[in-house]
Amino acid sequence: MLTSGHTDTSRGRSGSSDDDATGHSPGRHSRHRGGGRPRRRRRFAAALFGLLGVLLAVAVPLLPVVQDTTTITWPGPGPLAPVNAPLVNFQPQSLTATIPCAAATSADARSIQPASLLATTPPGSADGAAVAMVLQVADGKLTLISRGQALGTFSLGTLPLGTIPVSPERCMITISSDATGTTASAGPHQFVTVDQDVRPQVTGIYSVLDDKRDPVKGLAVQITPDTRFQSTPHPIKLAAIALAVVAVLISLMLLHRLDGRIGRRAPRLLPSGWWRPTGRDATVLAVLAVWVVIGGITSDDGYILTMIRTSSDMGYVGNYYRWFNVPEAPFGWPYELYALWAEISTTPPWLRLPSFVMGGVCWMLISREVLPRLGREVRRSAAAGWAAAAVFLAFWLPYNNGLRLEPVVAIGSLLALCAVERAVATRRLLPLALGLLAAAFTVAATPTGFIAVAPFLVAVRPLVRLLHQHASVSGWPAVIGPIFGAGLLVLVVIFADQTLAGLLEATRIRTAIGPSLSWFQEATRYQELFSDKADGALARRFPVLL
């Protein structure tokens, strides 16, 4: 008969064997051997569903979307008249124009000053000449200007002399402009060729041409707005997203079953007394509740509110004020939830309720999960608890009472920390996978969310040892599959209605325009904190110095 000491030695020597891992000899406990096949099935299923979740999550950025497209055409039905059509992205994806040569000659003949045949900003605009495209004619000479630069000229006076082998009635001036270049021609003569992006800003279509005095037959302007980011997921993409979520959930449930081989018995998710309120809880929640009503707004509340209110029209959350309104992706998924919340009301107390709820959850995690892990003296000290409450409020009130995403970072980082601590303490992998899931969504919320990765880096040695212990019993595929699936599941949220190409383009635009600070420029934040600007207010400076 094997003693318990021999059982432990047997498990350590051959942990990869199902029989040795239980400490029983094959012969004497053959009645229990039937459990080996279900365990092998669970290992195989955990690896299979975990790998399936990983593959589907990675495939989501590459799957198709349905792009909303629109075209502005001019002139419309009725009398010829200018049209206002300001583009949110400023530049169009493409612009084409066809203007009869006879109309240009007619407008030139009746105009004393240069006649604007086509302009993309209103005449007389103070800054229009620097950003618009203008085709003008003066004394029989065509000139195409884009963004303040003369691209080329052509003399119309040669047309009646037969230098162009078409009749003046059939002669057309054509313009084509997109991201790859701009061309212009009069009949078969091309007088503009630019192999770079000189697309103009478009606020409308304006011209001096008059359909009652000028022969405008054949006049046409077509503008395609840049709607690359206005898309919805294709049914194939929706199916992949749903399957990825289901596969990862199943793999995590199977991982929970496999945890019993190595890990200690799973403790209750929320121990008894977790919800029992204390005086500190009442004080913290009361202060947070009062601050919802009387607290000052954060510096970006109005900025973010406009972004989320325009998202319903755009089809995505973009930076309305900067970067040509490209999507916030890969960051900013909480803004999608804020946009739904703001549809109910935009009053400040209502908009602050999410941060109030997250503040309450953060305090519960700090007081119930973090402080007790700091030792018996801290756990039993009322002074330590009240000090923690004071520091928490000192940070939360000036920084997190609004629509900024720091509350999401705070709650996500705390969840990751608590999950890592529980994984190491219980020797179970499910908390590790859930913590990685929380960290991934925190990182995808805002760049400062990378702080949620810190608990994994600090505990890397015990976590690697834990992975080896479980892999020796269940195999690496069954261990790594569900964990990787949990970490990559955030991709289905980031790329739910965007593509990888769209995200890369949005990132390129933000980086090119800036400002974009490198990691070694972190000191800039502290310069702002001690400046005489709003970021240097005493309320913001105090908790950092504390």
Q: Each predicted region: which residue ranges?
A:
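Active-site lumenal/periplasmic loops and adjacent helix-entry segments of GT-C-fold
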Residues: 287-380, 394-403, 410, 532
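Membrane-lumen/periplasm interface segments of specific transmembrane helices
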Residues: 476-524
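Transmembrane signal-anchor helices characteristic of membrane glycosylation enzymes that use polyprenol
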Residues: 45-121, 125-133, 137-140, 273-301, ...
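Membrane-embedded helix bundles of polyisoprenyl
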Residues: 364-365, 379-461
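Extended repeat-based interaction scaffolds and adjacent low-complexity, acidic/S/T/P-biased segments
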Residues: 79, 83-95, 100-231
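Start-transfer (signal-anchor) and selected internal transmembrane alpha helices
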Residues: 3-11, 18-65, 227-291
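Juxtamembrane membrane-water interface segments that cap and precede transmembrane helices
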Residues: 218-230, 332-345, 508-539
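Perimembrane helix-loop-helix junctions
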Residues: 422-423, 451-485
